[in-house]
């Protein structure tokens, strides 16, 4: 079976990108007779004594009138070895955003350089953009070598300069080829003009370049696009989740987790356009059926239980600014489109602007203008499910949309989570002399979430007493109590709350590992906080139960056992959940407690949940 290679051309204006594509299409017999006749006639009308191959792809009237490429032109052609989709991108600096669009799906980029001019700023810019976009294969095509008499020294100088620049980028595969796109030398077949060049022709290289290893087949990521419920007599119980596999391989029977809620289940069936399939991999569009009835909607994601994306509202990214009449400034609000999820976001900060020529980081920059690149920090209103772009381009890329004009203003690539705390490589775990068999059975963690005053601590303490009366070792690990010691250094910003709950989660797993049944009353207002707690327990092999104390805000405020609501309403305290800080209701808690039942009844419901899971 022939494989498909997506490629794009890049480089400065008039370097010959459109001519090169025209040559590839013509020599591979991919130009229709009537189209070729039109190109020949237009060339004659302009007084050329040759056929202008650039006209094959320059389809807009403005392009033909000016002899330049403005929009991105996509063309398809094939050889016996491989199929190709090629994007002809513009070279003018004001159309850099178009180049980003054209190259965003490419697996290989051909960077054309006019041999007479050498490397120009725009050529460097495009090569750098290609590396940012995660493109692993670059071809340096030094064009118009015929105008320099096929000077080997000139070619070697340009090649060495480009390779020195590429060495500073994250690109491993760079191939340099001397060509003449107009005359076809070294484009489809090797040329007699370059006996000193021992490499392949351009087309031969495109046919043979290895791309099978570029796809991420390890990290299962399935963003849900649509929930299928036929509502017919024949399929009245059918529920499946449609989308495109972003990465990894899914098979029927696999254990998976639904994010951001963190529920685990199994795949029972996978359906493709023509019926059931044994497995699904990128870029297949399929629908997935699960063993359990879970509340899943567009924007959620299915992943492996022990291989999950980062769930966060705060992240750093490299962005390319594309707006003509606006600039990117910290504090501005935008819409983020990421996989199948669309959320509001704010630019929390601009770390630096990047000079693509020198790769210098200008930390004094206060804004990004058209075609400029920089590193920014973003905060979204609801969590996103992210991977680092270099690891997974599908879940590591996004666009920014202006909410006023609905126009795309930036393309972004998610960077590594530098805030994530990882142990030093010099820190080694100590193995206990006591084995798991010597200890009491592992305990469990019950995580109580809800607004302040919803009854979390009251129910948890009553459950603790009832369990101790039954001879079961139970302990209430109260988040407020930890703030008097271990977490005394933390405030109530979202970042500090996330760290507070991270520490709380790890302490809970240690207690549960000793055989205690741990009861954790903690507001944990965001879904990402609760998902993090569940993940920490899953990684430690500890059973985790989420209990939602579903007490309405007005009831909590009426109770106000600590007087905090009154202080929040008076403006004496800020970042108070339910007043000036959000609370995201759990979609699928393991247990929902409502105030229409007494505290004693609620405590018994929790105990019943634990006993049913034993």
UniProtKB/Swiss-Prot annotation:
Residues 1-441 are annotated as: Sulfate adenylyltransferase. With CysD forms the ATP sulfurylase (ATPS) that catalyzes the adenylation of sulfate producing adenosine 5'-phosphosulfate (APS) and diphosphate, the first enzymatic step in sulfur assimilation pathway. APS synthesis involves the formation of a high-energy phosphoric-sulfuric acid anhydride bond driven by GTP hydrolysis by CysN coupled to ATP hydrolysis by CysD. APS kinase catalyzes the synthesis of activated sulfate. Pathway: Sulfur metabolism; hydrogen sulfide biosynthesis; sulfite from sulfate: step 1/3; Sulfur metabolism; hydrogen sulfide biosynthesis; sulfite from sulfate: step 2/3. Residues 587-597 have a biased composition (Basic and acidic residues). Heterodimer composed of CysD, the smaller subunit, and CysNC. GTP binds at residues 11-18, 88-92, 143-146. Residues 442-614 are annotated as: Adenylyl-sulfate kinase. It holds the Pfam family GTP-eEF1A_C. GO terms for biological process: cellular response to oxidative stress; cellular response to sulfur starvation; hydrogen sulfide biosynthetic process; sulfate assimilation via adenylyl sulfate reduction. This is Bifunctional enzyme CysN/CysC. SUPFAM superfamilies: EF-Tu/eEF-1alpha/eIF2-gamma C-terminal domain, P-loop containing nucleoside triphosphate hydrolases, Translation proteins. In the C-terminal section; belongs to the APS kinase family. In the N-terminal section; belongs to the TRAFAC class translation factor GTPase superfamily. Classic translation factor GTPase family. CysN/NodQ subfamily. Residues 88-91 are annotated as: G3. It comes from the Bacteria. The active site is at 524 (phosphoserine intermediate). It comes from Mycobacterium tuberculosis (strain ATCC 25618 / H37Rv). Residues 180-182 are annotated as: G5. Induction: Induced by sulfur limitation and oxidative stress. Repressed by the presence of cysteine. It is an enzyme of class 2 (transferase). Residues 2-217 form the tr-type G domain. Its EC number is 2.7.7.4, 2.7.1.25. Residues 67-71 are annotated as: G2. Keywords: ATP-binding, GTP-binding, Kinase, Multifunctional enzyme, Nucleotide-binding, Nucleotidyltransferase, Transferase.
């Amino acid at each position: 079976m022939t494989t498909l290679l997506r490629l794009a051309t890049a480089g400065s204006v008039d370097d010959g990108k459109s001519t090169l594509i025209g040559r590839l299409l013509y020599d591979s017999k991919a130009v229709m007779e009537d189209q070729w006749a039109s190109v020949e006639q237009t060339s004659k009308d302009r007084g050329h004594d040759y056929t202008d191959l650039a006209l094959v792809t320059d389809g807009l009237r403005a392009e033909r009138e000016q002899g330049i490429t403005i929009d991105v032109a996509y063309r398809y052609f094939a050889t016996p070895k491989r199929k190709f989709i090629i994007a002809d991108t513009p070279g003018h600096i004001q159309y850099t955003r178009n180049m980003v669009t054209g190259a965003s799906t490419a697996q290989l980029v051909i960077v054309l350089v006019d041999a007479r001019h050498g490397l120009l700023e725009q050529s460097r810019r495009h090569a750098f953009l290609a590396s940012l976009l995660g493109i692993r294969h670059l071809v340096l095509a030094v064009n118009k070598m015929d105008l320099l008499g096929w000077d080997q020294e000139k070619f070697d100088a340009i090649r060495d300069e480009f390779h020195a620049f590429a060495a500073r980028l994250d690109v491993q595969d760079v191939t340099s080829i001397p060509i003449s796109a107009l005359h076809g030398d070294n484009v489809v077949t090797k040329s007699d003009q370059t006996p000193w060049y021992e490499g392949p022709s351009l087309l031969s290289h495109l046919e043979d370049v290895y791309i099978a290893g570029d796809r991420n087949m390890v990290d299962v990521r399935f963003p849900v696009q649509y929930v299928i419920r036929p509502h017919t007599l024949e399929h009245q119980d059918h529920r499946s989740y449609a989308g495109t596999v972003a990465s990894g391989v899914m098979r029927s029977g696999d254990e998976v987790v639904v994010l951001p809620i963190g529920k685990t289940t199994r795949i029972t069936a996978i359906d493709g356009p023509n019926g059931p399939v044994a497995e699904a991999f990128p870029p297949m569009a399929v629908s997935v059926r699960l063993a359990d009835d879970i509340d899943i909607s567009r924007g959620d994601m299915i992943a492996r239980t022990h291989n999950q994306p980062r769930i966060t509202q705060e992240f750093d990214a490299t962005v390319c600014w594309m707006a003509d009449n606006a600039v990117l400034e910290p504090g501005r609000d935008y819409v983020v489109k990421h996989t199948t999820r669309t959320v509001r976001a704010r630019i929390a900060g601009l770390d630096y602007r990047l000079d693509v020529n020198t790769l210098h980081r200008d930390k004094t920059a206060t804004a990004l203008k058209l075609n400029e690149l920089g590193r920014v920090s973003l905060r979204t209103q609801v969590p996103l499910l992210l991977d680092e772009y270099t690891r997974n381009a599908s879940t590591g890329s996004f666009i920014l949309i202006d909410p006023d004009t609905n126009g795309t203003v930036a393309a972004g690539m998610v960077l590594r989570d530098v805030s994530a705390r990882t142990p030093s490589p010099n820190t080694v775990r100590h193995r206990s002399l006591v084995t798991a068999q010597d200890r009491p059975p592992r305990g469990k963690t019950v995580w109580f979430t809800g607004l302040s005053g919803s009854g979390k601590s009251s129910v948890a303490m009553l459950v603790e007493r009832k369990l101790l009366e039954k001879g079961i070792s139970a302990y209430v690990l109260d988040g407020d109590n930890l703030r008097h010691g271990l977490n005394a250094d933390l405030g109530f910003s979202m970042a500090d709350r996330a760290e507070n709950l991270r520490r709380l989660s790890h302490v809970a797993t240690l207690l549960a590992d000793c055989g205690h049944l741990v009861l954790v009353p903690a507001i944990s207002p965001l879904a990402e906080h609760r998902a993090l707690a569940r993940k920490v327990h899953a990684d430690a092999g500890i059973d985790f139960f989420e209990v939602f104390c579903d007490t309405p805000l007005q009831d909590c405020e009426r109770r106000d056992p600590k007087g905090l609501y009154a202080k929040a309403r008076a403006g004496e305290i800020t970042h108070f959940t339910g007043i000036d800080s959000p609370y995201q209701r759990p979609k699928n808690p393991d247990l929902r407690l409502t105030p229409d039942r007494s505290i004693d009844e609620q405590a018994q419901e929790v105990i019943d949940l634990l006993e049913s899971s034993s």
